[in-house]
Amino acid sequence: MTPSFRLIAVLPAIFVACLSQPLAAADNDLGRAYRAIASKRFVDLTHSFDPRSPVWSGFGQAKMTPAADPKTQRPYTIKEDGFRTTLYEFVGQYGTHVDPPAHFDEKGITMDAIPLKQMILPLIVLDATPYLQTDPNHAFSLTDLRAWEKRHGRIPRGSFVALRTDMYKDWDTDPERFKRAPFPAWSFETIKFLYEQRGVVATGHETLDTDTTDKMESETYILQHGRYQIEVMANLDKVPPKGALIVVTWPKVRNGLGFPARAFAILP
């Protein structure tokens, strides 16, 4: 069992252990795992978003307004009420977000039913950037994947596999370019291979969609086979090809079909 897998096995219970006894006295597996993890570098894989952030044209921009008293319509303020809060209105697939199976499959599980153990996984990062100079809309192929495995080894079963394209750099600086289509993404054959031959748990990418075309065959395959994906990821260029962990979570919306997520990597 690799160090990454040992950490995954105990990470979900660390937070409970921290509540039940002081960390200084915690000298069990969880305490040691916590100290190991706390000493590592963390990388945020999530974009900040607001009403100006890029989104698929079929959804429209978010709205964020001061929440108001429903009786008076007066916005709450710290001066008058001692607090303030915001009313958010946006589609579930906004910013860095989770797509659960039910997003594309009427019989698929919703975001509140995705197992907790699938939110902490070994992270593999495939780098598509070497191919983008000659093909800006490159679909990461099986040939590309085999070249990666020849260099870094076989992708472990149970991993989260993310595709690096560096598209995330346009999120704040050039939102219109970020929304361009087509864009670099997955090939359908690679997605099928990862799930069927490598047994990965989930996949993610930096772009607004899974596919380089509007056929959505890769996304349809993922979600209709009971898997989830994370879209619009950031900072994958700051994560090594293998050896890191990913932690990804989201609000527990009952029967939710998607929602902004928070993802981060713990580096080896």
What is each residue range found by the language model?
Residues 1-11:
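Bacterial N-terminal signal peptides that target proteins for export
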